[in-house]
Amino acid sequence: MPPKPLFPNVFPGDGAPRKRRLALALLAVPGLVPAVSYAQLSGAAAQPQPLDSPWDLRLAPQLEDHPLKDGAKPAAFVIADHTSGTAEQDLAAKGSAELRRGDAVVKADAIHYDQDTDMADAYGQVKVINGGTSFAGPEAHLKIEANQGFMTAPKYHFNVTGGSGSAERVDMVDNERSVFVNGTYTACQCSTNPAWYIKGSRFDFDTGADEGTARNGVLFFQGVPIFASPWMTFPLSGERRSGLLPPTFSMNSSNGFELSLPYYFNIAPNRDLTLTPRIISRRGVMTEATFRYLSPSYSGTFTANYLPDDRLAHRNRYAIYWQHQQNFGGGFGGYVYYNKVSDNTYPEDLGSANQFINGTQTLYQQEAGLTYNNGPWSVLARYQHWQTLPPSIAPYSREPQLNVKYTKYNVGGFDFGAEADYSRFRITTADATEGDRIVFNPYISYGVYGPGYFVVPKVQYHFASYDLNYLSSTTPNSPKRFTESIPTVTFDTGLIFDRSVRLFGQDFIQTLEPRLYYVYTPYRDQSNAPLFDTAESDFGLAEIYQPNTFVGNDRIADANRITAGLTSRFIDPRTGDERARFVIAQQYYFADQRVTLNPGQAAVLARHSDLIVGAALKLGSGFMSETAFQYNQNNNQLVKSSVGFGYSPGERRVINVGYRYTRANTTLDNQPINQFLVSAQWPLTRRLYAIGRFNYDLAGDRVVDGLVGLQYDADCWALGVGVQRAANGINSSGQQNSSTRFMMQLTLKGLSTVDNGLVSAFRAGVPGYTPLPPPPPPMSRFSNYE
């Protein structure tokens, strides 16, 4: 018969030594303690497995809690070299004493336990373990089941979160809450000399709420105090909690030294607020606030920045950014994008003060809209306005716009649809044409697809009606009301051949894909139509199979041309990955294109377009390449070229080299683009990584932007530094301004992890950049099971 719990069987005078192996056997009695195992399984494998004999123990495949029945009390067990006590009352245990009751474990040189009050007094090398938290000290007094009591000079460790520290005294309130007096806290795993720690006069820990609070706290890093506060809160794990975020230090040539001290408010699981005082040495103190909200039917972000009495600009400066998405249900939705700055130089002076960016934003969108999407229907109603900063040219605003689209696929083999749009165009530029425009664009196509071919004829129609209420002085004789009707016919066809080939000792499937694309659009005079939303489209592989050489609805190019292209791919038959692709394409004109963007421009008189050639390679060992060329055969000139190579043999190892060239043209103010670019992320040691980006303008003999950074990844902290020099607007003489910025970001793992701009800059500047690894996941409370 299995032995019973120890306490009811201890009689007065029973002080004989007990063999430890016998006491340990008590703990193995089935049903008295939870079965344990370190394997974590699921499904049928996670169920206890019976053995052949009904009297054998069952296997427990994972650690489990077995709650007691209502009204039941947990059994208590004692292990010691010597025990003595009174039945049903108290017990004294000496010599490697150990008391267990429920989830609680007390170990000490000597333990006195009063069963009536559930009070345990432990002396000498005391260790208390309860609910995944362990305390070690010279003396402890506590109620076992309630986990209420105190310990002197404790050292503690939260098994689940990894936090630890020491104090003069700890008062245990319950299984989740504890109060430490004159103590320390760190999430570093090393027991001595942690890289960072918080020292305070009092700590309140709540493992259930995953939150710690320090009174009169001082944050130390490498033994040096870096921050102090009379009250601070912090998370005990990686979950979101209110508290201080890592400070950000930066320096640039216009603002001087800057220090940002963000504080995070975890208002609710779906709402938070980050409040950041930003000390700018040359301008003053700026306040930034970012509020985020999320619900099943809406979400958004609101950010406001305010700098009172800028010491350099001698005025108040501010910026507002608001993005909101709304789902009303039934396919209805809405949104708001509102961005505004106080003055024309705000982006240059303050917009990128603590973040690295390339260039300066000069267009700020102010838009609100309602949407509807249901099956083939798509509807947009919006009001759109722009705040435009020099030197940008103000675009037209839509005040308002109503856009309706209908699309249907494969109805008896036909695809058809239409787009209807009404817009009222307004602009802040003086002496510019304004008015209303209605557009209706229906289409129908019939596609025939086979295993190795496709044929898609398509007919589309463009109807536009203009009602202009103001004409620019440059076009005083243009009509205010007129319409346009322009049909377009396209015929798209291609073949697909494939074969098996073997190259460089590897098998591939090679395809050969010739394609012909014919477009016919008759000429219609469109010189009376203003350019509300229209520009010349780029010319490349993405645009060469499009019917219109313009983007927007104010110009439809006349066309009688055919595009001939040939694509060849090399595909890995085992994985389906495309390892190489080669493309060549060119347009051939049967008639001159007479429609131009602006009246008076010369018509396109060439017999064929520039030749487009492209290639993409994805080889083994992390090597890849993309190349594209645009070549003018008539002038024997290279119009555009783009060459890029990438090498990434492993994680956080990437090198990119690129070159791009664009011949001077009127769009570029007759200035060519001739730039060389290299970027990389590479480990210098096991913990130290270098990041760099260098963009050099060969034509202008200047650095467009450069970025150099280092990241160091330690066990419980990470440090990143970066220096960037970039173009930053245009000065009064029309020359490019350049600014230099320095930024440093310290991350204390286990305290808070946030990117204040440096990692985002590395990611944007280096394609393929991989951030430093996150902290390891929290341990199970059974990881240090005793």
From Swiss-Prot:
<dbReference type="InterPro" id="IPR007543">
    <property type="entry name" value="LptD_C"/>
</dbReference>
<feature type="compositionally biased region" description="Pro residues">
    <location>
        <begin position="770"/>
        <end position="779"/>
    </location>
</feature>
<dbReference type="GO" id="GO:1990351">
    <property type="term" value="C:transporter complex"/>
</dbReference>
<dbReference type="InterPro" id="IPR050218">
    <property type="entry name" value="LptD"/>
</dbReference>
<comment type="subunit">
    <text>Component of the lipopolysaccharide transport and assembly complex. Interacts with LptE and LptA.</text>
</comment>
<comment type="function">
    <text>Together with LptE, is involved in the assembly of lipopolysaccharide (LPS) at the surface of the outer membrane.</text>
</comment>
<dbReference type="GO" id="GO:0009279">
    <property type="term" value="C:cell outer membrane"/>
</dbReference>
<keyword id="KW-0732">Signal</keyword>
<protein>
    <recommendedName>
        <fullName>LPS-assembly protein LptD</fullName>
    </recommendedName>
</protein>
<keyword id="KW-0472">Membrane</keyword>
<feature type="region of interest" description="Disordered">
    <location>
        <begin position="767"/>
        <end position="786"/>
    </location>
</feature>
<feature type="signal peptide">
    <location>
        <begin position="1"/>
        <end position="39"/>
    </location>
</feature>
<dbReference type="GO" id="GO:0043165">
    <property type="term" value="P:Gram-negative-bacterium-type cell outer membrane assembly"/>
</dbReference>
<keyword id="KW-0998">Cell outer membrane</keyword>
<dbReference type="Pfam" id="PF04453">
    <property type="entry name" value="LptD"/>
</dbReference>
<dbReference type="InterPro" id="IPR020889">
    <property type="entry name" value="LipoPS_assembly_LptD"/>
</dbReference>
<dbReference type="GO" id="GO:0015920">
    <property type="term" value="P:lipopolysaccharide transport"/>
</dbReference>
<comment type="similarity">
    <text>Belongs to the LptD family.</text>
</comment>
